[in-house]
Design a protein with these regions (language model features):
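Alpha-helical, hydrophobic structural elements that either
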Residues: 13, 19-429
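N-terminal Sec-pathway targeting helices
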Residues: 1-14, 20
């Protein structure tokens, strides 16, 4: 009898442990942001056509909330439910880490749909992730009034993708490749270099988010060494199917410039990276590549007026602003709109000035690049670029420290980019 009672007690204890373990492993994964937003990991989908897993609304399961995402290739999509204050929409991206924490890649929001007021389901397509690992780590990088912040909490996500892939042959560094008469030599490629810029609060110095890819080039055109070409943009891919785009900037440390850097790269232990690099000139332009405009009027306005100007140009079917000037540059028709001076809440409330351009056809679709070469105000002071937005042939630029500006003088160029591809293995910092 005592044995029966003992075994009954043991069975109850084991059952309780099993239930606790089940609840532990199946409890929702939640990250809370500093503004009170609650993010819940819903699930992942893998393939060409994506709809979110079932989510519960008022205790009932629901799936058809309108959020869908399609792709031509098999892709991995992460679904997240965001609970937030009504009319206060969260702004964040995901950072994807391997288990060994050797590197990471970021993913921005691709689509979303409202479940109910204050609750949205969001889709993030992972164009780069550690495909060879059974699990990956996701952290949240949020943007708000407190600046850029990285979450301490994380989502642990199983990898539903295949883990076998081909290997690419690599060329040794230095590696020289060409586009037309331009020969470019990749002289340096280092993954995991310390970034000149910190990614924000909650990100330690050694976090992969604070690492970058350091690289450098030599140029020859028609057999002569050249110094007026610069790398602009790079697409980094690997044989596993990862692909990520980055903008290339100078590598500045301790007031010195040493080549170039970009973020993010891929995982450095992969046997090969393929880099498709866009190069642009900074001088040596012909007359038909240059447009100089003087006395562009500056109108007083607000930050919302700047946003409205962008929206008006982007939505060509809506009401369009009147252009101050227009012409054709290198086969591209360009319209320049009056500038707006405003109090910039994103720059400490100081005075900034913004102007917009509309180019048709889209220069980037033609393998070309539109670049502001020089801008000054009516008093001859050169202005400091604070930021820019572009896409679909629409361009908008912001300049800080723009007090008492009445007019702008600017020069833009439109010229053909060159594209060079390297297949190499990076060294590690």
């Amino acid at each position: 009898m005592k044995k029966i009672i003992l075994w009954t007690i043991v069975s109850v204890v084991i059952a309780g442990i099993a239930v606790d373990a089940y609840l532990w492993f199946h409890k929702p994964q939640i990250i809370k942001l500093s503004d009170g937003t609650k993010l819940t990991f819903v699930g992942v989908t893998y393939g060409k056509h994506h709809v979110p897993p079932k989510i519960k609304i008022a205790g009932r399961s629901s799936r058809d909330n309108g959020a869908r995402l399609d792709s031509t290739n098999d892709t991995l999509v992460v679904w997240i439910e965001a609970e937030h204050k009504p009319n206060q929409y969260p702004n964040f991206e995901l950072a994807v880490y391997d288990k060994a924490n050797t590197a990471c890649a970021t993913s921005s929001l691709r689509t979303q749909s409202q479940v109910k007021n204050g609750v949205d389901v969001m889709a993030f397509r992972l164009d780069a992730f550690p495909r060879w690992d059974g699990k990956m780590i996701l952290r949240v990088i949020s943007y708000g009034q407190r600046g850029q912040q990285a979450s301490k909490e994380q989502f642990v996500v199983s990898n539903p993708a295949g883990r076998s892939y081909a290997k690419w042959a690599t060329d040794p560094i230095p590696d020289t490749q060409s586009d037309g008469d331009l020969s470019v030599t990749l002289t340096k490629l280092v993954a995991g270099a310390q970034s000149p810029y910190n990614r924000g609060n909650g990100v330690t110095r050694n976090d992969p988010l604070n690492k970058c890819v350091q690289l450098d080039f030599d140029f020859q055109q028609k057999g002569q060494s050249m110094t007026h070409w610069r790398p602009v943009r790079v697409v980094t891919s690997d044989a596993a199917g990862n692909s990520i785009q980055g903008w290339i900037n100078g590598y500045y440390q301790n007031g010195q410039t040493s080549g170039y850097q970009y973020r993010e790269g891929l995982w450095p232990d992969e046997p090969a990276w393929k880099l498709r690099v866009e190069f642009s000139r900074i001088s040596g332009f012909s007359d038909d590549e240059v447009w100089a405009v003087t006395n562009v009027p500056v109108q007083p306005g607000t930050q919302q007026d700047v946003q409205n100007a962008w929206n008006s140009n982007w939505n060509s079917s809506g009401k369009s602003n009147s252009a101050f000037a227009e012409t054709t540059v290198n086969g591209i028709h360009v319209k320049l709109f009056p500038a707006i001076q405003y109090q910039d809440q994103n720059n400490g409330g100081g005075q900034s000035v913004s102007y917009s351009l509309k180019a048709d056809p889209d220069p980037e679709a033609q393998g070309m690049r539109l670049t502001p070469l020089k801008i000054s105000d009516d008093q001859g002071r050169e202005l400091q670029n604070r930021g820019s937005s572009w896409g679909g042939g629409n361009y908008q630029y912001q300049y800080s420290n723009a007090r008492n500006v009445k007019a702008l003088n600017l020069t833009i160029v439109i010229h053909k980019s060159r594209y060079v591809e390297f297949t190499v293995k990076p060294s590690k910092q």
